[in-house]
């Protein structure tokens, strides 16, 4: 009888082991973080996404990266899917939160913490790490207009749907008011992705319209890829008198500056610093700590 009872107890214990292990596995499952961006084709955006992903994985989280490829409706769907799939946090990268404000608010209401990197900020988010884009717009515009001798003509290449880029364009408009002898000939929207080739094509067409040297003195680009495309077009056309500036400080831009091309200056953003700041705050929040909410700026540096 004792032997039979012992066998029954052992059998019950063995039956309990799988379910116990399963329950334990569930409780130890890593929290999921979703990264959502429409601009993974951009060198700098890709750099930030990869840096954030690496740091969060190292901190023990599972990371899912969603690239909506410049499709805002797909971006909205990616955020909604991130909530439904059980993400504990969502990071929007290079996104104006106003585009997806409803989805961000719904995510926050569902208990999902939302963060931004090189994005904008709304109250339902935890924070956004970026450069002070308006200040950078002031810096690069002032640099270029002074470099032009405070007179002449220029063209502006931009992409106003991007929250940081549009702030730089606003700053350019304000700075231009202090330079009455400088004229903005035209502003052009640059397609993303394919921004280098599109910018090159835009400038090639401009050079056809303005074939004489001195008809265009400068091209102000709101970020580096358009400046790279503009520089390529100018070099091929032999228009080495036209000044070009950009923002971001990516490797190809710095190389063109060092080679003495039309590309004269850029502002180097600390994208690694932004990524580190976001990854740190995400980790704190998901570990039950509180963080200071709002915009958090990382300084930029002029390279010429």
Predicted stretch roles:
Residues 80-85, 89-108, 172, 192-254:
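Hydrophobic alpha-helical
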């Amino acid at each position: 009888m004792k032997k039979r009872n012992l066998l029954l107890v052992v059998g019950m214990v063995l039956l309990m082991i799988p379910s116990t292990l399963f329950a334990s596995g569930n409780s130890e499952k890593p929290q999921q973080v979703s990264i959502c961006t429409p601009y993974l084709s951009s060198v700098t955006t890709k750099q930030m996404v990869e840096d954030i992903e690496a740091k969060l994985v190292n901190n023990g989280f599972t990371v899912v990266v969603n690239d909506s490829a410049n499709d805002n409706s797909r971006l909205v769907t990616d955020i909604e899917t991130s909530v439904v799939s059980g993400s504990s946090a969502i990071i929007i990268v290079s996104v104006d939160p106003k585009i997806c404000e409803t989805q961000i608010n719904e995510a926050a209401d569902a208990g999902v913490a939302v963060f931004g990197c090189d994005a904008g900020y709304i109250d339902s988010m935890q924070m956004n790490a970026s450069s002070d884009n308006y200040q950078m717009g002031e810096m690069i515009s002032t640099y270029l207009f002074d470099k032009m001798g405070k007179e002449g003509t220029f063209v502006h290449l931009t992409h106003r749907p991007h929250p940081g880029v549009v702030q730089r364009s606003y700053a350019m408009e304000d700075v231009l008011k202090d330079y009455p002898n400088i004229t903005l000939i035209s502003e052009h929207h640059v397609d993303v992705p394919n921004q280098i080739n599109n910018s090159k094509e835009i400038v090639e067409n401009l050079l056809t319209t303005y074939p004489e040297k001195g008809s265009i003195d400068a091209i102000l680009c709101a970020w580096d890829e358009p400046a790279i495309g503009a520089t390529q077009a100018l070099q091929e056309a032999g228009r080495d008198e036209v000044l070009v500036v950009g923002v971001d400080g990516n490797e190809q831009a710095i190389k063109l500056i060092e080679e003495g091309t039309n590309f004269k200056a850029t502002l180097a953003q600390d994208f690694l610093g932004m990524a580190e700041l976001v990854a740190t705050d995400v980790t704190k929040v998901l570990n039950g700590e509180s963080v200071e909410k709002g915009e958090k700026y990382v300084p930029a540096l002029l390279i010429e």
